[in-house]
Curated annotation (Swiss-Prot):
Protein name (database record): 4-hydroxy-2-oxovalerate aldolase 1
UniProt keyword annotations, A-Z: Aromatic hydrocarbons catabolism, Lyase, Manganese, Metal-binding
Domain Pyruvate carboxyltransferase positions: 14-266
Reactions catalysed according to its record: (S)-4-hydroxy-2-oxopentanoate = acetaldehyde + pyruvate
Active site: H26
Ligand binding (substrate): R22, D23, S176, H205, Y296
SUPFAM superfamilies: Aldolase, post-HMGL domain-like
HAMAP family from the UniProt entry: HOA
Any one Gene Ontology BP term: L-leucine biosynthetic process
InterPro entries: 2-IPM_HCS-like, 4OH_2_O-val_aldolase, Aldolase_TIM, DmpG_comm, DRE_TIM_HOA, PYR_CT
Residue ranges of coiled coil: none
GO molecular function, one term: manganese ion binding
Residues bound to Mn(2+): D23, H205, H207
Length: 353
């Protein structure tokens, strides 16, 4: 059976996934409470959001010293979300090497029905066994090719083929750094669509670090993407994700059906999601540097922490992280960069005297 048959639904042309409760976990330092998750899931479900992603920001098993500890165990939040949603499916993210096969099984037992497996865009092969397990369990599968801006479209399409052959039903172009600009999205999505045909759908996950999350998502749809991510109020890492409420407004205006009510999702963003945010997701200097330099969006909070600890500018940390082409999982190298900048500052002060 082709993906056209599996995913056909007369109420949408594009299926939306709200990732406020996963990508937003980065912005909230993984401190979601059960009350917040229950309220947000209920509001998104009422608005007609078909898929809601719930996990630690770094996926199953992400609660750790390296990534940050969760206030509430993620499996409890997945279970609560599944019990709260009346129509929406609950998705969960896992990164091979962070999460395990047992984590996937537990998430399914707690009500998760869509397994989203993420790898760096050149390492799709590490996801093969996890896709195999997810399909054996009867889970819907989605693949994330993170930091998709770092390799050309034809190389990305080859990696997408690895995921599709392993059992992935939709492969995402993931602009983890918010670094892609319009045609960069279009070319990558088109390459994946051409490679995968009816074997798997193509999706797009954008960030706002250059202010292009919505525009890039429109480009993705016009190039053939059938699944799109966003977060209410841009609740995500860096400057946040493409705001779902804005995406729905734009899609309504250009005739792309999503099945989500614009006014209900605007209400959810304003009245339910916003109060759960520690602050608005800002397109400030730090976020812009990440988009401009191609830095993984979740590095923001880690860079701010090391900036405060060592007394060095966060935007300089982020720029050097981009120069070194660091990827997700290498957040600890920000400490080395901070020490390097600190030494340069100290030697400069000494030389001045």
């Amino acid at each position: 059976m082709s993906t056209k048959d599996i995913f056909f639904n007369p109420i949408w042309d594009v299926r939306m996934t709200d990732t406020s409760l996963r990508d937003g976990s980065h912005h909230k330092r993984h401190q979601f409470t059960k009350d917040e998750v229950g309220a947000i899931v209920a509001a998104l479900d009422t608005a007609g959001v078909p898929v809601i992603e719930v996990t630690h920001g770094d996926g199953l098993g992400g609660s750790s010293f390296n990534y940050g500890f969760s206030k509430t165990p993620e499996q409890e939040l997945i279970k609560l979300a599944a019990e709260t949603a009346k129509e929406a499916k609950i998705a969960f993210l896992m990164l091979p090497g962070v999460g395990t096969k047992e984590d996937i099984k537990e998430a399914q037992n707690n009500g998760g029905s869509i397994c989203r497996i993420a790898t760096h865009c050149t390492e799709a092969d590490v996801s093969i066994q996890h896709f195999g397990l997810a399909r054996e369990l009867g889970l819907e599968t989605v693949g994330f090719l993170m930091m998709s801006h770092t390799i050309p479209p034809e190389k990305l399409a080859q990696q997408a083929r690895i995921m599709a052959d392993a059992g992935c039903q939709c492969v995402y172009v993931v602009d983890s750094a918010g670094a892609l600009v319009l045609e960069g999205v279009r070319d990558r999505v088109a390459a994946l669509v051409a490679e995968l045909g009816d074997d798997a759908q193509v999706g797009f996950h954008g960030h706002e670090n250059l202010g292009l999350g919505v525009a890039n998502s429109v480009e993705a749809v016009r190039a053939g993407a059938k699944q799109i991510d966003g977060s209410c109020r841009r609740f995500g890492a860096g400057a946040g994700n493409a705001p779902v409420e804005a995406l729905i407004g734009v899609f309504d205006k250009i005739g792309v059906k999503t099945g989500i009510d614009f006014f209900d999702i605007a209400d959810a963003a304003e009245e339910v999601v916003a109060p759960a945010m520690p602050a608005e997701c800002l397109l400030d200097r730090n976020a812009l540097i990440m988009g401009y330099s191609g830095v993984y969006s979740s590095f923001l909070k880690h860079a701010i922490r090391q900036s405060e600890r060592y007394g060095v500018p966060a935007h300089q940390l982020l720029h050097r992280a981009g120069q070194r082409k660091l990827i997700g999982g290498q957040e600890d190298q920000l400490i080395d960069i901070a020490l390097e900048i600190k030494r340069e500052q100290d030697s400069g002060a000494t030389a001045a005297h």
